[in-house]
Each structure stands twice: as C-alpha cells, then as structure tokens.
Regions:
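Non-catalytic helical/linker scaffolds that mediate oligomerization, partner binding
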Residues: 1-403
Length: 403
C-alpha cells in the first residue's frame, strides 16, 4: 500500500503530449484528452505551486506548473511523449498531503491479515511515523506481520536511519526513487541504503529494472548483468524482478539468468571477502554474539553455522556479518521459516519445538546435519542460540560441536 499518485483514464486510452503545449491536471474526474486528465488526489492543487516539475510515467514525461486555479493545475509540457491510462505522477519538490496508509490500504489489510502471507510492504514511506501507523493498524487487527519499507521518496532518504530502525525489512525501490531524486544519485543511494541496513541487521531488497530488457529479449544487456552483480557485491539480501517476470516474454529465462549471475558473484565474493573487522561502536549482545560466531567459524574452519531461532532474529544477527559459511536458520515457527528466506545466506530449516535442554538440542542438530547434510566425521559446526528458548530475541550463546 501507500499513497501512489496516478492520473486517470483517457477517452482513447492514450494521448501524445507535445513540448510547449498546455496540459491541465484536474481533480474533477472524467475521461481525459490531449488537453487534460484527472488525478487521484483531491488535495494535489493545494500541494503544488508554479514552477514545480511534474513527472509522469516513471519520469519519461515532464510538465511544469504554470498556475493553480481551484481544482485545476495548469502546466506546460517540457518533455513530451505518449501518455496512457493510470500512469504514475510525481512532484519531487512538493510535500504531498495524502495519508501514508489510504482507505483502500486499510480495507486490503483487513483481508491480508487473514491470509498466510509473510510480509506486508508500505510504498512511498516518508518517515518512521508512517511505519508506526501501519504497525498500529496491524496490531489492532491482531497481526504482527513484519513490514517492508519501500524507500522511494526523498523524505525517506533524509530520515533513512529512523525509517530502517522502524521497519523489519527495506526495499530500494529504484523506479520512483530515480524520479524523486536526481538519477545520478540513485547508484550511491542504493549503496548507502544497503550499508545502513547491514548496520541495522535488517534484510534489504534491491528492485526495479534489473533485467528490464528481458521484458522483450531472451538475454539481458551487459550493463544489466553488471547491475545485478553490483547489487550482490553491495550486500543486498535479495534482488527482485518486476515486469520481467510479471508481463515479460521471457519470465523463466529472466529468473535463470538472474540466478546464474547471483551464484557467480557470490562465489567470487566468498573467496574475496575479508575476515570481519572489529566495529568502531559498541554492539548489542545479539550482534556481538553474531560477529563472534562468524569469527569462531573462520578460526576453526567450520563447515556451517547453525542458528537456533524462534523469531529469526538470531539468524539475522549472523547474516549481517556476511560469513563465508552457510547459515542454517533452524526454527520451530513456520512463519519464521518462511520469513528467513529473505535473509542473506540463510537456509531455513523447520523443526519440532526445541528440546528445552540445550545439550540435547545441539545433539539433535548435529545428528540432523550428519544424516541430512552428509557432513563428514570431524566437521566443525558453530551453533548460536538465545537461552532460555522461551525468551524470544535473546541471542546470548555460542557452542562449537564436531560431527
């Protein structure tokens, strides 16, 4: 959900806007034509002023506000082109007065909380207050669904750290971000957002136009392959396809190509990744345990790191240090098992409730690894957990076992 601004429909489905022509945005509704079109936000005339740039269709068309008269915004076309129904609209310089969670969003949420979904995402986040509002709405509906904050507005970038702290995961939504902010800033903003998410141990998704040419072509451009690889090297937890798999002609090929690029890049990164250096700040206990577990795994040449976790927090603390070893996120909670699929380097494993005796729980895990993962005798396994198991979110224990 979130406050996405859109134009309405045209009588003929689309129109061509020519540079220098006047074009009116109106809140009065009705079908549009070559001279006017409706918008879905009644307060927009009060939010904009003469001189503001208005971008349409992911920034491909640009208008400039000339005057505001009642419910109409008069503009002049600066960059023209074809414009079709329901395209997005953005005014980067304006403080848009739409609510962060719309009436439709709340109605959708009533249905979503009854479904077996794992995350809910909020578009056009402006500050941490937007996330708090959605979280309160979830709580009122009896849900603790984690929230993915889509970073695509300049206001969210300005309050990046508080937004990340308030969210459970983040998406670098480069489409609208590249309209709201200068396009030359987007690659650096991507790196900054990913780095901040790593610091906070929050999963981050990089999205939009990663393999855009594969909407119509069976192979990506070289630049797109580099884009995917660089997102992996930046430290993203996940990369996302949109039109490539939703409406493109080669959805399976797009997934296969992206997977191949990820695997090749991860193999390179695993070889080149330096050993973790000490942080220049005080760490929370769970974070310190995660870092220590990764260092211990390197020191004893462990084959795998195991995280015994109820909520998934223990596995996230491990993943933020990007260890060379795979992480097994072992949990008795099926929703945590699903949610951990988003986290870098974690292979989720669902199990029965943990034995309250930690020694017995470790023995069970080692036996599982020996039988199911085919670990050779003498292989080292680093295990992390929060004890007692009933106390969620308390990562405080490391153990090294030998298979």
């Amino acid at each position: 959900g979130g406050p996405k601004l859109r134009i309405g429909r045209f009588a003929g489905g689309s129109v061509q806007l020519l540079p220098g022509n006047r074009f009116v945005l109106t809140t009065d509704g009705g079908e549009g034509d070559a001279g006017r079109v409706s918008v879905n936000h009644a307060g927009l005339p009060g939010d904009v002023k003469p001189g503001d740039a208005v971008f349409l269709n992911d920034g491909l068309l640009r208008l400039e506000v000339v005057a505001v008269r009642g419910n109409e915004i008069e503009t002049v076309v600066k960059v023209g082109g074809w414009l079709s129904d329901k395209k997005g609209l953005s005014v980067p310089a304006a403080e848009i007065s739409t609510p962060s969670v719309t009436g439709k969003d709340w109605r959708d949420l009533d249905f979503l909380v009854t479904q077996p979904i794992d995350y809910v995402s909020l578009s056009f986040v402006r500050s941490e207050k937007d996330i708090a509002l959605l979280r309160q709405g979830l709580k009122e509906r009896g849900s603790e669904l984690p929230i993915v904050a889509k970073i695509e507005k300049a206001q969210a970038v300005q309050r990046l750290e508080p937004v990340i702290d308030a969210a459970d995961a983040v998406m670098v939504a480069r489409g609208d971000l590249g309209v709201e902010c200068p396009i030359a800033d987007v690659p650096l903003l991507q790196k900054r957002i990913i780095r901040a998410c790593l610091e906070a141990a929050k999963p981050v998704i990089t999205a939009t136009q990663m393999l855009e040419s594969m909407v119509g072509n069976p192979r990506p451009t070289r630049a797109e392959a580099s884009d995917v690889a660089n997102a992996v090297l930046d430290g993203t937890d996940a990369v996302m396809l949109s039109a490539e798999s939703a409406t493109g002609r080669y959805p399976l090929e797009a997934v296969r190509v992206m997977r191949e690029i990820i695997l090749n890049t991860e193999e390179f990164a695993r070889r080149e990744r330096p050993r973790s250096q000490g942080p220049d700040r005080e760490l929370a206990v769970g974070d310190a345990i995660g870092r220590s577990a990764c260092l211990a795994a390197d020191s004893v040449r462990a084959t795998v790191i195991v995280s015994l976790t109820q909520s998934g927090a223990t596995a996230r603390y491990l993943a933020r240090w990007r260890p060379r070893q795979p992480i097994l996120g072992v949990t008795p909670v099926r929703r945590s098992w699903n949610q951990l699929s988003l986290v870098w380097g974690v292979q989720p494993v669902v199990t029965e409730a943990f034995d309250p005796n930690f020694d017995a729980a470790c023995e069970h895990i080692v036996a599982h690894l020996r039988e199911e993962r085919h670990l050779s005798a003498g292989a080292k396994v680093v295990i992390t957990a929060g004890l007692p198991f009933a106390a969620h979110g308390r990562t405080n224990t490391i153990r090294i076992e030998t298979t």
